[in-house]
């Protein structure tokens, strides 16, 4: 895939995380800070408990979520403080500790290259259907992530950052947060797959 397509896929995946349980729109209420805190907790727990499986999303997102599912069991978070900056802006300060799975992409690349070499050496290489390719890709990515998660030298990141909510027409919307997206995808960089 081209780098631009990978970036588009990453944006789709990240937007799915943000929109999984319609967190982008929260009905205005008496205690907006508490509602926003609870909704953020619900989004994280929904993702950690596999709720994304019931969402409609593209194949790349489905493969990614299925592969990184085990990582959510090793993730922890704490909402430190919620501040109402003004009547239209609330800031949630959160700390998320998550496994660094960035090395899983290199493992995944190697698995793909090994499969390619195996097919090239085969006297009768098999042409796979799209469904077979998706299944194989999912398997390789899941194996790569699990290999990284089971590594005794697995590193963790612990990041503290703000998530901003802005009120539009009496509804609260979570603003894009690259730090939140990085944590929820465990520092995976799919655009690195096309490099080298």
Each language-model region and where it sits:
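Sec-dependent N-terminal signal peptides
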Residues: 13-23
């Amino acid at each position: 895939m081209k780098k631009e397509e990978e970036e588009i896929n990453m944006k789709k995946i990240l937007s799915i995380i943000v929109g999984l349980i319609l967190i982008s729109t929260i009905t205005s209420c008496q205690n907006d800070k508490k509602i926003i805190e609870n909704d953020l907790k619900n989004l994280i727990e929904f993702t950690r408990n596999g709720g994304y499986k019931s969402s409609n999303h593209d194949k790349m997102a489905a493969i990614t979520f299925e592969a990184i599912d085990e990582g959510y069991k090793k993730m922890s978070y704490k909402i430190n403080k919620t501040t109402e900056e003004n009547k239209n802006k609330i800031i949630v300060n959160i700390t998320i500790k998550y496994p660094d799975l960035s090395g899983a992409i290199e493992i995944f690349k190697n698995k793909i290259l090994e499969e390619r070499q195996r097919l090239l050496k085969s006297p009768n290489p098999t042409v796979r259907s799209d469904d077979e390719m998706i299944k194989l890709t999912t398997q390789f990515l899941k194996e790569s992530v699990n290999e990284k998660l089971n590594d005794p030298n697995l590193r963790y990141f612990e990041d503290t950052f703000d998530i901003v909510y802005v009120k539009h027409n009496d509804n609260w919307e979570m603003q894009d947060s690259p730090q939140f997206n990085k944590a929820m995808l465990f520092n995976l960089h799919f655009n690195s797959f096309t490099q080298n």
